[in-house]
Swiss-Prot record:
Biological source species: Gallus gallus
Coiled coil feature spans: 446-480
Basic and acidic residues composition-biased segments: 82-91, 133-150, 347-379, 469-479
Single GO cellular component term: nucleus
Protein name: Activating transcription factor 7-interacting protein 1
Functional description taken from the UniProt entry: Recruiter that couples transcriptional factors to general transcription apparatus and thereby modulates transcription regulation and chromatin formation. Can both act as an activator or a repressor depending on the context. Mediates MBD1-dependent transcriptional repression, probably by recruiting complexes containing histone methyltransferase activity. May belong to a complex that represses transcription and couples DNA methylation and histone H3 'Lys-9' trimethylation (H3K9me3).
Length: 1085
């Protein structure tokens, strides 16, 4: 009691922690003690606190309820007397609250309530000491001690768990938030607890609280003791929790100052400090404020001011909230409990005062908190803590208990505060860690996205460069090839092929596509336009004239063809021109016009050029282009153009020897119009017939041509042939032509299956599919026809270089990159009879066969042979041997009758276009090859490479090693230098290639190496000669592995590198396997 008096006299204020609002609240509380008592009306919280029983609000509500009940029951007197009794009942309710609360935020609130109850119990004990409660106080102390252990573990846990919960509750309950003036509320709570021990019970159950307050008031000592004991136990627990959460530093000094009531103060401060206490005060205050300021006022009045310890740590609102949200509330709670314990006697007065203060203060806090904490709602306190808000802990510690009790309480409070603080710190740390993890995850996710974007952009850039380079190469090759083609009729055909090749080469896939687009729009019209017009439009001027008469121009046309491939109209023109040179018939140009359509379909520029060129003069080209293209032709517009073209071609063709096929073609072509394939086929046939009659005779395209009707069928069969071409194509030209023709058409449709597979094999799959006929045909054709002999592909590539030389070359290059893999297929396919066809078989073959078959039945047969024997095929073999292109043709062309073949090629071109395989042959042989070859060539180029020693054609044979003049005797005991293993890598800057070489195992029997000689080979669509291997450097031997970096390359080109060792005796070791790299791409093959 004395102790209580002392604490009443002392008001401790923490400088920092005291909020302005808290001070105001304190002042208001002091001023409005009586008013606070009046606030009993705020029983509204009873409902809340009843609900609050289950939830956070319940503690607050209960507290308020208790207060309300106190006020109702006779706030001041009742509070004083009831405080003793009520503390018991309240403690009981608090106990019940506390027990359930630990599980949930409500637990925290309940803990707070419990703390309050404990305070009440402490007060009750004080009163009990005065009355009978003193004995109870001892019991309470004992229980507090017990509960200290229990509560710390249980409630502290709940505090830890609910470390947010007390504050959350406080926050949740604006009332709790009001706890900002925890001191007031604590005092209030103390008094409320004392008075409203019943009230706390009310917290458990408002009804109970009401009854209990009265009962407890009536049942003084007994209930008090029991309740007080329970309350003390619970308060100990709360206190422990609060102590944990509360900062011991703050609490201890205050407790020490409050030494007289240290025990109760300890309990109280602990509870106050504990989140529970804070929550309890907050809850009580808030509940009081929310339920009824009067209750709080009552509570405050009831609570003696004696040990009004105000820890303004911003327990509720601020600092401690952040760090020890729970702790601060506990702090306030503990002080309250301590207060309550101390205050028992004077708590009534203090409680009244405090209640007033709390009410005012609670109201003020409440406002503050409601605004700040309302956001979080009733749970805002805890959430706030979670939200890292600052908490103010106000501790009103009124210790009315004896010193021994005070000491015990102080210890309990310290322990509880420590535990609570630890819990709060853990919670803060966990939350911070979780936030950090989230941020890290976001950052990593962003990094991944950026990386993916960067990679995609880099790939796009590389592809763009590659296409640009391929385009340039194709243009250069085209320019180069046209000249040769101009050289002679054969040359012209060759040129046409070369042009086609060049065109192809020039037209990288991209160019082809672009051209195609251009052509696509203009193509139908262009095609429809007179063949001459189409050629004219195509490269139009040159081609038209070429188309008109000059086969030499045809080469040009070829180029245009290539161009045409690029643009539909051009394609047509080109084809026409090419064919003119090939067939040396304008019909061819007409075919070309048709071709454009076909070419257009092929989309694959390279194949189109090939097709165009292959068809150069005829629908064949279209067909060839079009296996897929053909389909395009078959498309109504395409058909229309084709039809017109076909007719024109037919007439033109008719004029020409091949005209017979042409004538048939016309009819057929008309049919073709219906089926673009037909027209193309016809054209191709015609062209083939015309030119090929001679050249293609071999082909027997003529038979096909002869079978103009066949052609029609061919066009329709084109697809069939396509499929057949692979097999049939190889098997029978004559039959195939028609088949091919039909297949051709199918080719476009069907050919996707056959040709398309081949085509797809060819790099362009889909595009090629479309252009498969053309593209695959071209490539395949070249390959197939050419490759029909294995080399054929490669040869074909070269042939294409000749025929499609330009066109093919370009396509080859462009395609070559993509196609390399395909080319192998073609090669392999080549191996296979259907290889060509397979190539798509080169759709061209099927198409060509169709066209060629129609035009060149022989060709088809040849094609058939070629596919099977590919090499066996005369033309194909020839083609295989040499790319159709004149230049390459020379090599391969040599095999093929360059002149006739070339002419055939033009025709074949048409035919070739028609039948991918035949075309392939044709292409291989001549322009057709080129036309067909363009794409195929591209596809086949790698095969070509393979054809050459290391690679078909391309890596040309490596130069022979010169023999040293004479060897010293010691050299006889040593073997030649070992064969190095070469690896290529790209420098990130994209402007350098790193060559690194080593040996798998060091052979001791070899003489020491003096130097390494580096050779480079620039892939050229023209004939591949060993002389093309150039020595680029000599490096003094160093311990392996060695490496050097080469720079200054022509972008878009393909380079092959080889290394060989020279020993100290001047002997050269074997070359390493040549390695190639595409300067456009960052990959080395």
């Amino acid at each position: 009691m004395d102790n209580t008096d002392e604490p009443q006299k002392k008001v401790f204020k923490a400088r920092k922690t005291m909020r302005a609002s808290d001070r105001q609240q304190l002042e208001a509380v002091y001023k409005a003690k009586e008013d606070l008592l009046k606030t009993t009306e705020v029983k509204l919280l009873n409902g809340k606190h009843e609900n609050g029983d289950s939830d956070l609000n319940s503690p607050l509500s209960n507290t308020d309820c208790t207060e309300d009940k106190r006020e109702v029951n006779g706030l001041v007197d009742s509070n004083e007397i009831s405080e003793i009794k009520r503390p018991e009942s309240r403690a009981e309710s608090v106990v019940s609250d506390l027990e359930p609360k630990p599980l949930s935020p409500v637990n925290v609130t309940r803990e707070q309530d419990t703390d309050v109850a404990l305070v009440c119990e402490a007060e009750n004990r004080v009163l009990g000491s005065n009355k009978v409660n003193f004995h109870e106080e001892n019991n309470i102390k004992n229980r507090l001690d017990q509960r200290e252990s229990d509560t710390p573990s249980g409630e502290n846990k709940s505090n830890c768990d609910n470390s947010f919960s007390p504050e959350e509750k406080g926050k949740t309950n604006d009332i709790t938030i009001i706890s900002n003036s925890p001191v007031e509320e604590k005092k209030k709570a103390g008094e409320i607890i004392v008075e409203d021990t019943v009230g706390e019970e009310a917290i458990s159950s408002s009804m109970e609280t009401d009854q209990e307050p009265k009962n407890e008031r009536d049942g003084t000592a007994g209930l008090s003791e029991t309740v007080v004991e329970k309350a003390v136990d619970e308060s100990s627990e709360s206190i422990l929790e609060n102590t944990d959460s509360m900062e011991a530093d703050e609490i201890i000094p205050i407790l020490e100052k409050l030494a007289p009531a240290e025990d109760e103060m300890s309990c109280f401060s602990k509870s106050a400090l504990l989140p529970v206490d804070d929550t309890a005060p907050d809850l009580e205050e808030k509940m009081d404020n929310c339920l009824s300021s009067p209750l709080k006022q009552e509570s405050n009045e009831s609570l003696p001011k004696e040990a009004f310890l105000v820890l303004s740590d911003e327990e509720d609102p601020c600092d401690e909230r952040e760090h020890a949200e729970v702790i601060l509330p506990n702090k306030s709670g503990l002080p309250e409990e301590v207060e309550k314990s101390e205050e028992e006697d004077k708590e009534r007065e203090v409680v009244h005062k405090e209640e007033e203060k709390h009410t005012e203060r609670g109201e003020v806090s409440r406002r503050k908190r409601s605004k700040s904490e309302d956001m979080d709602s009733v749970h805002s306190k805890r959430r706030r803590f979670v939200g890292e808000e600052d908490y103010e802990a106000e501790f009103q510690v009124k210790i009315t208990a004896r010193r021994d009790v005070d000491q015990k309480l102080e210890k309990v409070i310290q322990r509880v505060l420590e535990e609570k603080l630890a819990a709060l710190q853990c919670a803060v740390f966990d939350k911070t860690l979780a936030d950090l993890k989230m941020r890290i995850e976001k950052v990593e996710c962003n990094k991944r996205h950026k990386t993916v974007l960067t990679e995609l952009q880099a790939k796009i850039t590389r592809l763009t460069k590659r296409f640009g380079a391929a385009k340039e190469d194709m243009k250069k090759k085209q320019e180069n090839t046209p000249n040769p083609s101009l050289s002679s009729g054969k040359a012209a055909s060759s040129t046409a092929n070369a042009n086609n090749l060049t065109y192809r080469n020039i037209t990288t896939v991209r160019q082809m596509l672009e051209s195609k687009r251009n052509v696509g729009d203009s193509k139908p019209a262009t095609l429809q336009a007179p063949v001459s017009a189409a050629p004219a439009s195509s490269l139009a001027a040159p081609q038209t004239p070429a188309s008109g008469h000059p086969k030499p121009q045809t080469p040009v046309t070829s180029s245009p063809l290539t161009t045409t491939v690029i643009s539909t109209a051009n394609t047509a023109t080109v084809v026409g021109t090419s064919q003119v040179p090939s067939g040396s018939t304008q019909p061819m140009s007409v075919s070309l016009q048709s071709l454009p359509v076909i070419l257009h379909v092929p989309v694959a520029v390279s194949s189109q050029p090939q097709l165009l060129q292959g068809h150069a003069g005829t629908l064949v080209t279209n067909q060839q282009s079009g296996s897929v293209e053909f389909i395009s032709v078959q498309s109504s517009s395409t058909v229309g153009s084709l039809t017109k073209t076909a007719v024109s071609l037919a007439s033109t063709n008719t004029t020409k020897p091949n005209n017979s096929p042409s004538v048939s073609s016309p009819g057929v072509q008309r049919n073709s119009p219906a089926s673009a394939g037909s027209v193309r086929t016809t054209l191709a046939v015609q062209a083939v017939s015309t030119t090929h009659p001679v050249a293609q005779t071999t082909r027997t395209s003529l038979p096909t041509v002869g079978t103009s009707g066949l052609h029609n069928s061919t066009s329709s069969r084109g697809p069939i042939h396509m499929k057949i071409p692979l097999s049939a194509f190889n098997s029978t030209a004559p039959t195939e032509p028609p088949t091919i023709t039909a297949p051709r058409v199918e080719n476009q449709t069907s050919r996707p299956p056959t040709d398309s597979s081949a085509n797809k094999r060819t790099a362009e799959g889909p595009t090629q599919s479309v252009k498969v006929t053309g593209s695959d045909s071209g490539g395949v054709i070249d390959l197939t026809l050419d490759d029909e002999d294995d080399v054929s592909s490669q040869a074909e590539a070269k042939k294409q270089n000749q025929t499609a030389s330009t066109a093919q070359s370009i396509p080859t290059q462009p395609l070559s990159r993509p196609l390399p893999p395909l080319q192998p297929n073609p090669l392999q396919q080549t191996g296979v009879p259907t290889s060509g066809p397979s190539q798509t078989t080169i759709h061209v073959l099927p198409t060509a066969p169709t066209t060629v078959n129609v035009t060149h039945r022989p060709v088809t047969q040849t094609a058939a042979k070629l596919p099977i024997p590919r090499t066996p095929t005369n033309h194909q073999v020839v083609y295989t041997t040499i790319p159709a292109p004149p230049a390459q043709n020379s090599v391969r062309g040599a095999v093929m009758p360059s002149p006739s073949l070339r002419p055939v090629n033009p025709q074949t071109g048409s035919m070739t276009v028609r039948m991918p395989q035949t075309t392939a042959y044709v292409v291989n042989n001549g322009l057709t090859l080129g036309s067909g070859a363009p794409q195929l060539t591209v596809h086949h180029r790698p095969p070509q490479v393979h054809a050459e020693p290391p690679r078909p054609v391309h890596p040309a044979p490596l130069p022979e090693a010169p023999q040293p003049p004479r060897l010293p005797p010691e050299a006889a005991n040593t073997s030649l230098p070992q064969k190095p293993q070469l690896k290529l890598a790209r420098v990130q800057s994209q402007n350098g290639i790193v060559l690194s070489w080593s040996v798998i195992e060091v052979d001791r029997s070899c003489a020491s190496v003096d130097s390494y000689h580096l050779y480079a080979y620039h892939e050229d669509p023209s004939a591949t000669m060993p002389s093309q291997w150039k020595k680029i450097g000599e490096v003094k031997a160093l311990p392996l592995p060695m490496a050097c970096t080469l720079t200054q390359f022509v972008s878009g080109s393909k380079y092959y590198f080889a290394v060989r060792a020279k020993d100290i005796y001047g002997r050269f070791g074997p070359f390493c396997d040549p390695q190639s790299t595409d300067v456009i791409s960052s990959q080395s093959s």
